[in-house]
């Protein structure tokens, strides 16, 4: 059985609330650059964080963070590059995080219980030069 379509958006809302409670300043959600998207862009002190959120109802097909494949990482990096190009000072310290939300129980259109795991610096930009 596939998870409801609203599950991803609900997981992103949970992640944004979690980050705000941890002192992060949310700058943008669902930022799009061409066909690439970043779920959450936030400031952690002076560090600009590009955050991918993965929500699952079980770990039957692996940990949610495992679905952030090298291809998905490249898409996030492309979107981050577009975001940075629009800043007055694009030479800020950046970090790429993944937040995994494992939903324990669901209501009609919400997640009632969940576990959350924040993987800071989950991947880095490799020089392909």
From Swiss-Prot:
Family named by the database record: Belongs to the UPF0102 family.
SUPFAM superfamilies found in the cross-reference section: Restriction endonuclease-like
An example Gene Ontology molecular-function term: nucleic acid binding
Protein name, UniProt field: UPF0102 protein Cpar_0015
InterPro entries, per database record: Restrct_endonuc-II-like, tRNA_endonuc-like_dom_sf, UPF0102_YraN-like
Natural source organism: Chlorobaculum parvum (strain DSM 263 / NCIMB 8327)
Taxonomic lineage: Bacteria, Pseudomonadati, Chlorobiota, Chlorobiia, Chlorobiales
HAMAP family, sorted: UPF0102
């Amino acid at each position: 059985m596939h998870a409801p379509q609203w599950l991803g958006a609900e997981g992103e809302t949970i992640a944004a609330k979690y980050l705000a409670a941890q002192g992060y300043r949310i700058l943008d959600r669902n930022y799009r650059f061409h066909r690439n998207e970043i779920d959450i862009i936030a400031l952690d002190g002076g560090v600009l964080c590009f955050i991918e959120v993965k929500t699952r109802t079980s770990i039957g097909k692996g940990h949610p963070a495992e679905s952030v494949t090298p291809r998905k990482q490249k898409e996030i990096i492309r979107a981050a590059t577009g975001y940075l190009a629009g800043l007055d000072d694009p030479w800020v310290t950046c970090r790429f995080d993944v937040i995994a939300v494992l939903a324990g129980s669901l209501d009609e259109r919400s997640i009632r219980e969940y576990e959350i795991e924040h993987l800071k610096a989950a991947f880095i930009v490799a020089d392909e030069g």
